[in-house]
């Protein structure tokens, strides 16, 4: 994803766990209300549990590790990372978030081979929809089950992976060309 660089002292782990304003608000209330008998704390704790907040940190650490972060990196200020590592931290946040729609812009840039393999597996088993822009054909082949092509103000849907899309598109274009040639022959025949 093309995200802005982190500022302040937000750690890599905090960046990866900043998944929802509701969760952040519930956590802030929990920290601000030390009294276990407080109704506000009880409500915040219930909301935190509903949002799966108790497993969030463990999940984020697992995802960060999959993206090749070392445990020592988790508490490092995110602003000290290079652009490629910041991108990985944002990818971690997206995977931890588990949105219904995952939008990725050149997500394989800055990933080494091992990390790329892990990331492909995560995206391939993602339960929501994925909208991605990528020049990495191998990545597209491994994750795509359908392609939407936007061309000439039209949207066409193709089922299958990227190679299947290329084959289907070539077949469609060949059919259109054959139909056009037949039409031109008919026109020429009627003009004679």
Named regions from a protein language model:
Residues 181-192:
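Short cytosolic helices in intracellular loops of multi-pass membrane proteins
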Residues 1-182:
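ABC ATP-binding cassette signature C-motif
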């Amino acid at each position: 994803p093309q995200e802005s660089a982190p500022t302040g002292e937000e750690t890599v782990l905090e960046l990866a766990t900043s998944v929802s304003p509701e969760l952040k608000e519930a956590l802030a209330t929990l920290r601000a209300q030390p009294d276990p008998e407080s109704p506000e704390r009880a409500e915040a704790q219930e909301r935190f549990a509903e949002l799966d907040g108790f497993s969030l940190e463990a999940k984020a650490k697992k995802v960060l590790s999959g993206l090749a972060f070392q445990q020592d990196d988790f508490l490092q200020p995110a602003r000290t990372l290079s652009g490629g590592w910041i991108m990985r931290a944002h990818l971690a946040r997206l995977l931890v978030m588990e949105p219904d729609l995952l939008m990725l812009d050149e997500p394989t840039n800055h990933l080494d081979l091992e990390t790329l393999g892990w990331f492909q597996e995560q995206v391939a088993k993602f339960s929501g929809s994925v909208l991605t822009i990528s020049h990495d054909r191998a990545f597209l082949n491994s994750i795509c089950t359908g392609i939407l092509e936007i061309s000439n103000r039209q949207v066409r849907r193709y089922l299958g992976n990227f190679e299947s899309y290329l084959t289907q598109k070539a077949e469609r274009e060949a059919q259109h060309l054959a139909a056009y040639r037949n039409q031109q022959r008919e026109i020429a025949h009627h003009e004679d």
